[in-house]
Amino acid sequence: MLTERQELILKTIIMDFTQTHEPVGSKTVMNQLPIKVSSATIRNEMAVLEDQGLIEKTHSSSGRIPSSEGYRYYLDNLVEPLKLPESVYNTIGSQLDRPFHQVNEIVQEAARILSDLTNYTAFAEGPEKRDVKVTGFRIVPLSSRQVMAILVTSDGNVQNQVYALPHNIYGEEIEKAVHMINDQLVGKSLNEINVSLLSELAKSELGGEHVTELLSLVEDVLKDAASEQMYVDGQINLLNNTSEHNVKDIRSLYELIDHDNLFSNLMDSKADSKDKNYPIKVKLGSELPNDLLKNYSLLTAEYNVGSHGKGTIALLGPTNMPYSQMIGLLEYFRNELAKKLLDYYGKFQ
């Protein structure tokens, strides 16, 4: 554990470095410390911090920069959320205040707002759908071999997909199957409707000759409705932290975000943190499981929508980001997003 003075020096180095991105010397630290300390004493204390692996020297400067261990100590012991300018709060309020027609629209907008405010890559996952119920199901024929399945749930979401059917199924048979499906499924939560229930319905003669094909279609649309969709915005901002000459890394980063479930898993996992109950979790690049992310940090925040479940928002940015500002932003934003979703759900109660 560091002394109070050593902690102040480490905090000063990190806060200056995240603002200037330049190595920090003892004179800079002396001018910014809230206590009066000689330059010689600061140099001695910086040597102690360096010996402990919390700061390190670059080859091009006599100043020091934080190490991964230094950032981790700072995040676990010293960081304080910063109050943001009123204009930021006003922007969040005005952009979340517009009318939305589905939960997914709100969650997607959350990712866009966070990315715009930070110039980082933002992620957002909606609340769990554990208590969402089916309120209606329709199959609309588009041709003799093609239909659109439409599922409406109690949170106002409408899921629709187009399917090709293996047989000619006529309107009367579709209506018969839809009537049976609505009788059996409406009012049940997405979690209650499992494969065994659908199999039982398939054995029933109430749905007509092709009920099995239609129920497999229902199973697909139910899976999509129950799945947690992650929205990503600001992928272009990855270029700000990657060498423009390293085209291969840029392409790999894009593929990692667009096609891999890594971030969804990371957003669900708990970062190593001194306070396990702290609402904002931070994983440094050295703690992330892919070498492409070694110069990035992932900040995740959980938001709570009461009985409607919990969701997650996240930011992926450079390791030398201003953590106080970003943590302050995520703390405020998660509460505002939860309020917006509670207001939205209130319309359906």
UniProtKB/Swiss-Prot annotation:
InterPro entries: GAF-like_dom_sf (IPR029016), HrcA (IPR002571), HrcA_C (IPR021153), WH-like_DNA-bd_sf (IPR036388), WH_DNA-bd_sf (IPR036390), WHTH_HrcA_DNA-bd (IPR005104), WHTH_transcript_rep_HrcA_IDD (IPR023120). GO terms for molecular function: DNA binding. GO terms for biological process: negative regulation of DNA-templated transcription. Keywords: Repressor, Stress response, Transcription, Transcription regulation. It holds the Pfam family HrcA_DNA-bdg. It comes from the Bacteria. This is Heat-inducible transcription repressor HrcA. It comes from Lactobacillus acidophilus (strain ATCC 700396 / NCK56 / N2 / NCFM).
